[in-house]
Swiss-Prot record:
Record's keyword annotation contains RNA-binding: no
Top-rank lineage group of the source organism: Eukaryota
Disulfide bond keyword on record: yes
Name under which the protein is recorded: Cyclotide mela-2
Keywords, comma-separated and alphabetical: Cytolysis, Disulfide bond, Knottin, Plant defense
Amino acid sequence: GKPTCGETCFKGKCYTPGCTCSYPLCKKD
């Protein structure tokens, strides 16, 4: 399946492709 962008931001970055930091969690671009 596709990434869900649910990880926590680390130093303002997200490691899932197509995701951006919406502190404290990553959201879809």
